[in-house]
């Protein structure tokens, strides 16, 4: 179980780190993803630290989404991803709660966060279902032995 969480969080954080670098490189976002890491001097080290932070956050999201039941994983992933993306951009831009603030939101950033969250949700819910299926008895509980 721990290996699955580790592999999923590493894959999603690698995807997010590379995509954030691309968004910043092509100027699709106005902010710098590693600006908050001003304590670290080297640019590559900042990206590595961001990767580690994203890996930890991905593992936490995995553990949270693993406990969701009776809702399709795609729906959970999209809703959770949109919420994370909107909250992140609201905090980054320090936006007010007005309708015109939506124009500042970056669609590519929202899509990237949502796809990563859908990946984590699909993996978490699939593996939880596999664990539950493995815990089932091989016979009916009403069967007389």
PLM regions with names:
Residues 1-11, 44-48, 61, 65, ...:
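Generic low-polarity alpha-helical segments
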Residues 3-23, 85-134, 138-145:
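Alpha-helical membrane-associated segments of multi-pass integral membrane proteins
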Residues 5, 48-52, 75-79:
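Hydrophobic alpha-helical transmembrane segments
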Residues 10-54:
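Hydrophobic transmembrane helix segments
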Residues 32-44, 66-74, 120:
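Short juxtamembrane and helix-loop transition motifs at transmembrane-helix boundaries
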Residues 56-63, 115, 119:
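Transmembrane alpha-helix boundary/anchor motif
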Residues 58-84:
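Loop-to-transmembrane helix junctions at the membrane interface
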């Amino acid at each position: 179980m721990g290996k699955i969480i580790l592999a999923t969080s590493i894959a999603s954080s690698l995807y997010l780190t590379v995509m954030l670098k691309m968004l910043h490189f092509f100027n699709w976002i106005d902010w710098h993803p590693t600006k908050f890491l001003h304590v670290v001097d080297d640019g590559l080290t900042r990206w590595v630290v961001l990767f580690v932070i994203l890996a930890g956050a991905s593992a936490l999201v995995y553990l949270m989404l693993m406990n969701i039941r009776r809702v399709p994983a795609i729906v959970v992933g999209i809703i959770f991803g949109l919420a994370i993306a909107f909250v992140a951009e609201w905090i980054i831009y320090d936006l007010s709660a007005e309708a015109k603030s939506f124009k500042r939101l970056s669609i590519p950033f929202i899509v990237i966060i949502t796809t990563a969250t859908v990946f984590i949700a699909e993996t978490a819910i699939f593996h939880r279902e596999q664990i539950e299926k493995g815990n089932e008895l091989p016979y009916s509980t009403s069967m007389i032995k």
